């Protein structure tokens, strides 16, 4: 079966801090942020690529849900694949924003074979892996695409 990742949802405690991290450090385009701030939509999002978004659920949504926190103990990390050039720029932004690299650069196997990865956490402790694959076009912004 072939499919696309449509979205991932993070339950967040401080949505403004998370919007800032994912839009300024990770360079994911913010979506519906002004509408969220105006109370017109229930949560903001950031776009990873043309097919995938990350929804940032504020506490008022996930605290009242019967499913709040379910599965959190099962999520180890998520991984984004970048061109080598974008990966190197991310390293600089992480350093400039005092984000600690927990591991890496290290070789890792993934969806496109062997790549080079780093691991770090967002402001609320979610573990993120960022990798590049040798030989991919360095002008590509993000390899997560259909």
Regions found by a protein language model. Name each.
Residues 55-57, 129:
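Conserved beta-strand in the GNAT
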Residues 2, 10-54:
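Core segments of cupin and vicinal oxygen chelate
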Residues 4-13, 44-48, 66-146:
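Vicinal oxygen chelate
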């Amino acid at each position: 079966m072939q499919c696309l990742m449509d979205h991932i949802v993070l339950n967040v405690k401080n949505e403004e801090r998370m919007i800032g991290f994912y839009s300024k450090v990770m360079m994911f385009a913010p979506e519906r942020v002004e509408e969220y701030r105006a109370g017109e939509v229930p949560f903001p999002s950031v776009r990873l690529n043309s097919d995938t978004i990350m929804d940032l659920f504020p506490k008022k949504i996930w605290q009242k849900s019967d499913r709040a926190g379910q599965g959190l103990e099962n999520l180890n990390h998520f991984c984004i694949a970048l061109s080598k050039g974008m990966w190197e720029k991310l390293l600089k932004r992480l350093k400039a924003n005092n984000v600690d690299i927990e591991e890496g650069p290290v070789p890792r196997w993934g969806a496109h074979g062997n790549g080079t990865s780093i691991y770090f956490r967002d402001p609320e402790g979610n573990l993120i892996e960022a990798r590049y694959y040798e030989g991919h076009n360095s002008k590509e912004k993000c390899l997560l695409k259909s």
